[in-house]
Swiss-Prot record:
Function text: Catalyzes the formation of 4-diphosphocytidyl-2-C-methyl-D-erythritol from CTP and 2-C-methyl-D-erythritol 4-phosphate (MEP).
The protein, known as: 2-C-methyl-D-erythritol 4-phosphate cytidylyltransferase
HAMAP family for the chain: IspD
Pfam families named among the record's database cross-references: IspD
Enzyme class of the recorded protein, top EC level: transferase
Family per similarity comment: Belongs to the IspD/TarI cytidylyltransferase family. IspD subfamily.
SUPFAM superfamilies: Nucleotide-diphospho-sugar transferases
Membrane-spanning ranges: none
Biological process according to GO: isopentenyl diphosphate biosynthetic process, methylerythritol 4-phosphate pathway
Residues annotated as site: Transition state stabilizer: 15, 22
Gene encoding the protein: ispD
């Protein structure tokens, strides 16, 4: 049984500040995406890893050790996130992949235990996604003022890697018109059941400048491998 990981790193996000997209900025001396790749390369249940990049980032990507050594395959992304994922899925078609994990390149702190849980969840469901229950109070705002509250019962903060049986999510992407926020949306549009798996608070997506400092603190607190 072959499990592939797709690391989506084709975005041009600038909210993190700096001259480079967030996935190429340094985190404790390494590009964010290099740390993300390392997590999946070390996962015993992952047999193949694809990195989806923007064409302008090819030189940076080819300089990554995992890419230079041939252990990670590059795929150029599309005009949107779902188009980028579709390109990677098509690159895996016909190559004997049973399961696929789709992960944000800007989530470098994904834990091995979470990767394992996601793969195992596919024994019982065609799709699975990690999530953390919403614990903060939720407000509705208008014009800079609070105008109401929102019941948080049953609400979750979505994370990645989102896991799917390969042929099911490939068919779902081929049928989807585009514009999905994530792969769970694509899967559900195709009628696929998606199980919720316990996520991890440390599995943050590096998005804003302050996220780098938090991620470095979390890395420092981790035991040495």
């Amino acid at each position: 049984m072959t499990t592939a990981a797709i690391i989506v790193a084709a975005g041009r996000g600038t909210r993190a500040g700096g001259e480079l997209p967030k996935q190429w900025q340094l985190l404790a001396g390494q590009p964010v995406v290099a740390r993300t790749l390392a997590a999946f390369r070390a996962a015993p249940g992952v047999h193949r890893t694809l990195l989806v990049i923007h064409p302008d980032d090819r030189a940076r990507a080819e300089a990554l050790p995992d890419v230079a050594e041939g252990t990670v395959e590059l795929v150029e992304g599309g005009a949107s996130r779902d188009a980028s994922v579709r390109n990677a899925l098509e690159a895996l078609a016909g190559r004997g992949v049973k399961h696929v994990l789709i992960h944000d390149g800007a989530r470098p702190l994904v834990a091995q235990a979470l990767i394992t849980r996601m793969i195992e969840a596919l024994d019982a469901s065609p799709g699975a996604a990690p999530a953390v229950p919403v614990s903060d109070a939720l407000w509705r705002g208008e014009g800079g003022r609070v105008v109401g509250t929102q019941d948080r019962t049953g609400l979750f903060r979505a994370q990645t890697p989102q896991a799917f049986r390969f042929e099911a999510i490939l068919a779902a992407h081929r049928a989807h018109p585009g514009g999905a926020a994530d792969d769970v949306e694509v899967a559900r549009a195709a009628g696929l059941e998606v199980a919720i798996v316990e996520g991890c608070e440390d599995n943050l997506k590096v998005t804003y400048p302050g996220d780098f400092a938090r991620a470095e603190r979390l890395l420092t607190a981790r035991p040495a491998p």
